[in-house]
Amino acid sequence: MPTILERIMLAKQKELEIQKSAVPIATIEDQIRDMEIPLNFSGALFGDRIRLIAEVKKASPSKGLLMAEFDPVDLSKTYVDNGAAAISVLTDSRFQGHPSHLKSVKTITSSTRIPVLRKDFIFDPYQIYETRILGADAMLLIVSVLSQKQLIGLMELARALWIQVLVEVHNEEELKQALDAGAEIIGINNRDLQTFETNLSTTERLSPLIPENKVIVSESGIHNRKDIQRIMKAGAHAALIGEALTSAHDV
């Protein structure tokens, strides 16, 4: 039986073929020429305290609906007003996300100079051009769903389009792949994408293996101040938090 991740990737491939037919890549390339240079995502994550990447997320494959009354603009405004260093937007349909959510969020963040990360399952160059036209300042690449050749190629294209890349890893082997590919921002996912179980010890185990000149982001399984202190002690510069915020009664 296919894993959750395998089912997601199969569905994404089908969706992408439809999208490519509807909007040819040449059309997107023409629109990119007149766009402004994206904001500095990695620069927003440095400081004397741990930084928050707050996630705009309606649902998750593991827990289902997180917010019944979901407004990406209102939610991102709340995040910005409360000191988020960056905003992450889920654009994948499995999270009840949509690319339009990111464009909507940019209407709030552009004036405040807060960068926006596109979080999706990206594996094709077309998706990077799409990411740029949506206005994202950074995007996620997940090592476990890419070959090393794919990872390097997608990172090079993103760099050419001025998009910074958060490269997500879950174990030592994936971390080596990310570093070998030249990743500057490493996302340590505390969630195992095969089982969807979380454990903060993943950040504690992998963080010491990352060179000091890299930006470390701890992702998933972060619910309270104690968790923040734990990952900060491990060496994380930023925490990406979604479910704990979107499922809270008072964000």
Model-found features: residue ranges?
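Glycine-rich phosphate-binding active-site loops on the catalytic face of alpha/beta enzymes
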Residues: 133-150, 188-196, 234-251
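Catalytic cores of alpha/beta
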Residues: 123-135, 170-182, 218-241
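Active-site mouth loops of central-metabolism enzymes
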Residues: 53-71, 114-123, 164-169, 217-222
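Alpha-helix-loop-beta-strand connector modules within alpha/beta enzyme cores
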Residues: 36-43, 47-48, 96-121, 143-144, ...
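An N-cap/entry alpha-helix motif that binds or orients negatively charged groups
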Residues: 2-67
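Glycine-enriched alpha-helix->loop->beta-strand junction motifs that scaffold or abut catalytic
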Residues: 83-84, 108-112, 133-139, 159-163, ...
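Catalytic-face loop-and-helix region of soluble metabolic enzyme cores
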Residues: 185-241
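Glycine/Thr-rich beta-alpha phosphate-binding loop at enzyme active sites
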Residues: 58-69, 78-97, 179-207
